[in-house]
Amino acid sequence: MNKTKEITSVTLAHINDTHSYFEPTSLQLTLDIQGNKMMPFVSAGGFARIATRIHQLREDAKRMQRSFLFVHAGDCFQGTLYFSLFKGKANADMLNALNIDAMTLGNHELDMGNEPVAQFAERINFPLLAGNWDLSAERANKAHRLSENRKVKAYDTARRCANWITKPAGDSQVALFGLSLDKMADIANPDSDTPFVDALETARNTIDEIHRAGINKIILVSHLGYQADKELAAKVDGISLIVGGHSHVLQGDFSALGLSREEAYGQHINETYVVQAGLHALSLGHCHIDFDEQGKVVSFQGRNELLLGRRLFLDASMNEAGSDSAHLEACEWVNNHPNVVVCKKDPEVQGILLNKYIPRVRELQNQVVAQASHTRRHVRIPDDEGPSQLAPLVAQSFVHAMKNRGHPVQFAIHNAGGVRTSILPGKVTVADIAGKLLPFAVPIGVYHVSGQTIADTLEGAINNAINNGVEGTGSGSYPYTCHLKFDYDAEKPKGERISQLKILLGSEWQTVEAHQYYCGTSSAYTMKGKEGYDALLNMKDEGIVTNVSMADAFIEVLTDYPDLLSHHSQAALTSSSR
């Protein structure tokens, strides 16, 4: 880091919410070039392109005598087959290859509890920032203890602040700390012995402690979300830069490419700059920051860049490049867009994928388990076109898989947010299911609940999804079922909105009795009472969590009933809500 006339110069690059998108994405653009409209596809992002661009930026910083930092703002796990298959090992290898300086813990790192994070933290070569994660009461009998890993910069209970890292800045230091969602238990699955504490209070206390240590240049790497980052910047003094994630916001204007137009890169709030760089390794943010002796940012400039290949394609599979004059002109126009950087794939990073991970992923990508005769549409909340056509099938697969293992399940409830996409006509592969449709590697379980608890669960989930009398956590909680049907009246008083609740027992629909117990199945996430499902915590005993994932169950039912996605299977579907 260069210190000239008491100015400290830093270049910082950042990514967030990469969700195991190590390979490039086939990205469709919408272009209008002098009245010529076209919608070509382009190879976008991927870790090998990020590595190339980072190398260029490091060299630029070195030439300009600026120090260089590269951080990840959380959510590197769930999203593709690379996580479904390798459970964090590929993530550690690929992030190590990028040579990042630090990463903040995201909520999706904890979808499967602490154990995958603990194993990931043992493999990485960089600090994992988790400044409001209290590991002080972590159970001693765990195989991999986060509290004993010095790379994990968690909450310091004695000082009530985050542990931070420092990077040299000429004659001074830059401090970096991380914060994650403090309501983590509501949307993820952290172990009960490792709670998250208030992010705002932790931020204030941490800045005070960093100042006491004689450091006034402070960077927060946050996984709180874009609005929360801006609110924190307004409420807390002393932060130079907040590098954010969670909300997938791609700051800047990409509308000429048919993509989003968000606020300008580097929102300035209360002497703090706030940045975020999209999702899925499509883009990279970077900024030049100059600090004065008091730690104030006296110069800031930067941007988000979409990292693209050099050709435009006519199809999503990117097999046929556009070679006519219009596409060649469009290609040149895209390449000259101020927020686009065309770069090659770094051979070393690409080699890690090719040699260690791609062969197994390709094998699964080519393994066909079913044929879809028509589109099976997924929506979270039923709309004018109807409810999800997929979520009930997923719920049905839970019942099928659990019955195959001897569990006497009678119904299933699944949250809409656990299903991530629709199914289009054609071949359905293992990769489509485990990598796209049900990418969250969450197991399913079995439990016994009273009829009243079933009603309370359904009402709570819908109330949460539509914000009916509660401040909900999002539409993803909307419940889809197998072997249950019911009416929901939003106008009725809370606790009375579910009526005509029936369960399919054998071949007959029977009224659900309030005090009778029934055996159900849901994901382990739902069984923990997340997002409006808190009534399920009234289950008898603790329930059983199996080693069968959601994707495993759906693949199993399609393997046993390969025509389930055909036109003829619709009549056989015994799962509904009305």
Feature-to-residue mapping (PLM):
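Catalytic centers of hydrolytic enzymes
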Residues: 2-24, 29-43, 51, 278-578
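Acidic, metal/ion-coordinating pockets
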Residues: 1-308, 390-397, 412, 448, ...
